[in-house]
From Swiss-Prot:
NCBIfam families: betA (TIGR01810), PRK02106.1 (NF002550)
Biological process according to GO: glycine betaine biosynthetic process from choline
Residues forming the catalytic site: H465
Known role: Involved in the biosynthesis of the osmoprotectant glycine betaine. Catalyzes the oxidation of choline to betaine aldehyde and betaine aldehyde to glycine betaine at the same rate.
Cofactor: FAD
Annotated EC: 1.1.99.1, 1.2.1.8
Keyword line: FAD, Flavoprotein, NAD, Oxidoreductase
Cross-referenced Gene3D superfamilies: FAD/NAD(P)-binding domain (3.50.50.60), Glucose Oxidase, domain 3 (3.30.560.10)
Pathway: Amine and polyamine biosynthesis; betaine biosynthesis via choline pathway; betaine aldehyde from choline (cytochrome c reductase route): step 1/1
Name used for this protein in its record: Oxygen-dependent choline dehydrogenase
């Protein structure tokens, strides 16, 4: 079996590439996916988001090694093992990232990936329902909507931010990210709008696109040229050959693992596992980054939260309404207000993100409070801690060693203390006076630096945004894995295009920029002239040097 292009992974970037590479009919595309079909309400119903990311059926089941700086805790790292990849199990929050994120990429060696370069690709991929005119796309495959924000707590959160002196941002994916405002969702007609729904399924209707179910074991190379992929399907091993190129889009965990199993990575590490060296790239598996967050939870004195919907009868009613009409509380992820703010004067653009939720509950669906409550998920966006993904053995079936080194940099602790105290300030504003009860978490007794640090150590959670393990950069950067056209340095006919190529993590959730990578990489792969650069200038707070708001 062979095709012009062989893509490993049907996730955010992989699905976008399958769609674009096959678009004009000139080239054939095979997409290799080990995961299951994305069918059923647990995947497609937005409110059911806590289920698929905790189910072996849909998730690769990765966890970090015990993390020494957070008390030896091992944090789960869900990655989608399903059509659509992690876009089929994520929280459906849509964030492009800040303009300065991409300018930093370009300045660090990823030339051609500045904000002016990537903004046209964000516009090409979007079908924005209500975003800022002129800054948003309206004809792309990816539907992006805003929630209804029926609950008064959503408006209280935005008003509280304004009362605290922060900006209001009506469209954080438009000209101005900084401020409090509505959150955007990849939901369409009441359904999760994953990369599979947006890109892969339309592509699979074309005669030149084929989906092959199989476990990718390694890249097949002839000398230093990639010519195919060895896959395992059942008990059968076979090779799918690529006439032009192999493109890895297997996630920030599996992409570096696959490179190393194929002889591309740190020479000493590969030798340790008896793998023949093809290209010594010490950056493969390094530069691992993530976002962490804590939940600040408050009791609500009025019975207006989602707590009323957590009983079995209400869940059944919500499920039936969604199954019949794709409406109601099942048709939203309930993240409908957000904020991006700066932590201190001298910080040029936001480095803290908020998700607001009108219930006190964990991501795994367990209620933290036995009564009405609300919460903010808050965390710093630019941690200085860095980790790694390395091989546990040369067995492709064995999960890799994942070490994030969470909270290993002292600045991360100071940033999180500020996040906790800032959230208390926001919840203390007059807008919350009609609703505010006692603080559930951390609790009013947690006040000193040491007490807050202990709370963070025990309760900090991953936001599930791993990236950076196949860093994009200049060809003379010894830690770069791919060049600015996503080509693996030192190997021909092989590219990586997913969140693993991010030089540095972006502001916010990663599904949006991952899809953008797939869109832009497609033009590089096809040898097209990139879309014309934008001349639109993003808003930067004129007070950034003297004030945090």
């Amino acid at each position: 079996m062979e095709a012009d292009f062989v893509i490993i992974g049907s996730g955010s970037a992989g699905s976008a590439m399958a769609y674009r590479l096959s678009e004009d009919g000139r080239y054939s595309v095979i997409v290799i996916e080990y995961g299951v079909p994305d069918v059923g309400p647990l995947i497609q119903m937005p409110a059911a988001l806590s289920f698929p990311m905790n189910m072996e059926t849909y998730d690769w089941g990765f966890s970090s090694e015990p993390e020494p700086h957070i008390g030896g805790r091992s944090l789960v790292t869900p990655r989608g093992k399903v059509l659509g990849g992690s876009s089929s199990i994520n929280g459906m929050v849509y964030v492009r990232g800040h303009a300065c994120d991409f300018d930093h990429w370009s300045q660090s060696g990823a030339r051609g990936w500045a904000y002016a370069d990537v903004l046209p690709y964000f516009k090409r991929m979007e079908n924005s329902q209500g975003g800022q005119e002129g800054w948003r796309g309206t004809n792309g495959p990816l539907y992006v909507q805003r929630g209804k924000r029926d609950n008064p707590l959503f408006h209280a959160f935005v008003e509280a931010g304004h009362q605290a002196g922060f900006e209001v941002a009506d469209d954080y994916n438009g000209e101005k990210q900084e401020g409090f405002g509505p959150m955007e969702q990849t939901i369409h007609n009441g359904r999760r709008w994953s990369a599979a729904n947006a890109y892969l399924k339309p592509a699979l209707k074309r005669p030149n696109v084929k989906l092959v179910k199989g476990f990718a074991r390694k890249i097949v190379l002839e000398g230093k040229r990639a010519v195919g992929v060895e896959i395992e399907a059942g008990r059968t091993f076979s090779t799918i050959r690529a006439r032009r190129e192999v493109i890895i889009a297997a996630s920030s965990i599996n992409s570096p693992k696959l490179l190393m199993l194929s002889g591309i990575g740190p020479a000493a590490h590969l030798k340790e596992h008896g793998i023949d060296l093809v290209a010594d790239r010490p950056g493969v598996g390094q530069n691992l980054q993530d976002h962490l967050e804590v939940y600040i939870q408050q009791e609500c004195t009025q019975p207006i939260t989602l707590y009323s919907e957590l009983n079995l009868f209400s869940k059944a009613r919500i499920g039936v309404e969604w199954l019949l009409f794709k409406t109601g509380d099942g048709a939203t992820n309930h993240f409908e207000s957000a904020a991006f703010v700066r932590s201190k004067a001298g910080v040029e653009y936001p480095d803290i993100q908020y998700h607001f939720l009108p219930v006190a509950i964990r991501y795994d669906g367990k209620a933290a409070a036995q009564s009405h409550g609300f919460q903010a998920h808050v965390g710093p966006m630019r941690s200085k801690s860095r980790g790694s993904v390395t091989l546990r053995s040369a067995n492709p079936r064995e999960k890799p060693v994942i070490k994030f080194n969470y909270m290993s940099h002292e600045d991360d602790w100071a940033d999180f203390r500020h996040c906790v105290r800032l959230t208390r300030e926001i919840f203390g504003q007059a807008a919350f006076d009609p609703y505010r009860g006692a603080e559930i978490q951390p609790g009013a007794h947690v006040q000193t630096d040491d007490e807050i640090d202990n709370f963070i150590r025990e309760h900090v959670e991953s936001a599930f945004h791993p990236c950076g393990t196949c860093k994009m950069g200049a060809v003379d950067d010894p830690m770069a894995v791919v060049d600015p056209e996503c080509r693996v340095i030192g190997v021909e006919g092989l590219r990586v295009a997913d969140s693993s190529i991010f030089p540095r993590i972006t502001n916010g959730n990663l599904n949006g920029p991952s899809i953008m990578v797939g869109e832009k990489a497609s033009d590089h792969i096809l040898g097209r002239t990139p879309l014309a650069r934008s001349n639109q200038e993003p808003w930067i707070n004129p007070r950034w040097q003297v004030s945090d708001r």
